[in-house]
Regions:
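Disordered, acidic interdomain junction associated with two-component signaling
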Residues: 1-20
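Acidic di-acidic motifs
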Residues: 23-24, 117
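Charged docking surfaces used in two-component/phosphorelay signaling
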Residues: 30-38
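Acidic, metal-coordinating helix/loop segments flanking the phosphotransfer/catalytic sites
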Residues: 45-64, 72, 104, 123
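Short amphipathic alpha-helix used as the core "switch/output" element in two-component signaling
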Residues: 50, 54, 78-91
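Conserved phosphotransfer microenvironments
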Residues: 68-82
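C-terminal output helix
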Residues: 119-132
Length: 135
């Protein structure tokens, strides 16, 4: 079962789940993956929206999608999230960006949990819990 949350809407425990990280800036992606590892997650990472969708199709173990909003290429982070939500409605999603992500400022954004960069590991952990609570 993809993306199912345990009782109490708490994220899975250490080493049990795999997160797909879609971020085009390598240093930001590495830092985010390090924070996820410290929180007990395994990670797959990519800078491409197209590759992220391929990985989601090919890897049923992915239990969380974290995507940057602004990406190079044809697909934005919002495009990837919209497609992923259609294909995998039970997959928790976290949208990250340096931009203001409040819905009033961005009515076209997908209705998912979001986190504004830069963020701390504690803020990331709280956002992950909130992303699981939305499913």
């Amino acid at each position: 079962k993809r993306g199912g949350a345990p009782a109490g809407d708490e994220p899975p425990r250490a080493g049990e789940r795999l997160a797909l990280v879609l971020e085009d800036e390598e240093d930001v992606r590495q830092t985010l993956c390090e924070q996820l590892h410290q929180l007990g997650w395994l990670t797959l990472e990519t800078a491409s929206g197209e590759e992220a969708l391929q990985l989601l199709e090919a890897s049923p173990d992915i239990a969380l999608l974290i995507s940057d909003l602004m990406l190079p290429g044809a697909l934005s982070g919002a495009d990837v999230i919209h497609t992923a939500r259609r294909r995998f409605p039970a997959l928790p999603v976290l949208l990250i960006s340096g931009q203001d992500l409040r819905p009033a400022q961005n009515p076209a954004l997908p209705e998912v949990e979001w986190l504004r960069k830069p963020f701390t590991r504690a803020q990331l952990a709280q956002a992950l819990s909130a992303a699981y609570a939305r499913i």
